[in-house]
Amino acid sequence: MPASRSLGMSSDARVNNESGFILHTYPFKETSVVAEVFTRAHGRVALIARGARRPASALRGLMQPFSPLLLSWFGKADLKTLHAAEWQGGLVAPQGRALMCGFYLNELLLRLLARGDAHERLYDRYVETLDQLARSAAASDAERATAFERILRRFEKNLLSEIGYGATFDVEAGGAAIEPGAAYVFQPERGALRAAGQPGCPVSGQTLLDLAGDSFERLATLGEAKALMRALINHTLGTKPLYTRQLLRELTELNP
């Protein structure tokens, strides 16, 4: 159970029983770890889990991704101190390729979310996405691959929108309505332009309208949406590539 409030600790320095997930951990000093967590009410937070690497530590088995936790911490600095963690349960852990997709989500959140910014709707979408990935793992090979693509594209689109990089997909950069039969290119800083020798990510009008309507049923839409989301995410991230994206690409090449 979470420890009681320490005397002299101001209320704004302590958070108790906050829902969250471990995104990533790394060693800190001899026996501790730093856990980057994604929480519903406080966004991304960095926590020191003191002694978590000791064999007898109650925290040791909880410092794993994709497990719903209740987290309690204190501190006003950017790096806070975890003082309690409790497993909530209720979520099936992803396995196999679904697990790699989950690590991809975590890397996106680590790279794109600023610490301390709450994103409650995105948190709920993250929980829903993990559940969808785990449940889709039981489908046939062909159905599973397509399901994973749909799930990832929806999350990418929601993530970009949540952090302020959401694009308009149903209107051209000049204000005209997107035509389903027309060919376009999409530029991250301008939007959709008629594909008349313009640089950008090639995309059909129908795919843009499908994106605007959050519809990923067409296989052609899935393929073009993947390239477009990659272009938008790369534009937001800068030059450093996503490690898990490369791993997913290599897995696809090994298991076509």
UniProtKB/Swiss-Prot annotation:
Belongs to the RecO family. The gene is recO. Pfam families: RecO_C, RecO_N. Gene3D superfamilies: Nucleic acid-binding proteins, Recombination protein O, C-terminal domain. Keywords: DNA damage, DNA recombination, DNA repair. The keyword Hydrolase does not apply. GO terms for cellular component: bacterial nucleoid. InterPro entries: ARFGAP/RecO, DNA_rep/recomb_RecO_N, NA-bd_OB-fold, RecO, RecO_C. This is DNA repair protein RecO. GO terms for biological process: DNA recombination; double-strand break repair. It comes from the Bacteria. The lineage of its organism: Bacteria, Pseudomonadati, Pseudomonadota, Betaproteobacteria, Nitrosomonadales. It comes from Thiobacillus denitrificans (strain ATCC 25259 / T1). Involved in DNA repair and RecF pathway recombination.
